[in-house]
Amino acid sequence: MKCPFCGNLETQVVETRVSEDADFIRRRRQCGACEKRFTTYERPDVNFPAIVKKDGRRIEYKRGKILGSMNLALRKRPVSTEQIDSAIERIEEKLLSLGVREVPSNRLGELVMRELKKLDKVAYVRFASVYRSFEDIDEFKTLVDEVRR
């Protein structure tokens, strides 16, 4: 593997660890030329279904987009990065288990809302209010009442 510091192609693996849930492998490598160390991660290369937008456009699934949306909803909420990553993993597992080539964006949105509801009720309401395009306070009230039950 190419060294990110000097570009040398000769590096050696000095340590290998499997993640707790066995989803990826972490490797510490050392460059043979500059002797600097760096970390790489290996995870299976999977093909997620394409996301079909409301207007019919098809876009590729992007983990970063889900992460950004969830982080926005969870801003200043007491939820750890690990909890968010686990929620995204569950969303991705569900997407893959569907066994389809395309998923409507509203289905993905529902999966995100389900995970947010488990993590933090305030974040769930924040996300749902934007996702469902609330237009008046009564829609907020209905959702908050639903969450309180």
From Swiss-Prot:
GO MF term (any one) = zinc ion binding
Q: What's the cofactor? A: Zn(2+)
- Single GO BP term: negative regulation of DNA-templated transcription
Domain ATP-cone spans what residues?
49-139
> Could you list the residue ranges forming a coiled coil in this record?
none
What binding details are noted for the cofactor?
Binds 1 zinc ion.
- Zinc fingers (unnamed), as residue ranges, are 3-34
Which domain of life does this protein belong to? Bacteria
Keywords of the record, alphabetical order, are: ATP-binding, DNA-binding, Metal-binding, Nucleotide-binding, Repressor, Transcription, Transcription regulation, Zinc, Zinc-finger
Tell me the protein family, please: Belongs to the NrdR family.
Q: What does this protein do?
A: Negatively regulates transcription of bacterial ribonucleotide reductase nrd genes and operons by binding to NrdR-boxes.
The protein's name: Transcriptional repressor NrdR
Organism equals Polaromonas sp. (strain JS666 / ATCC BAA-500)
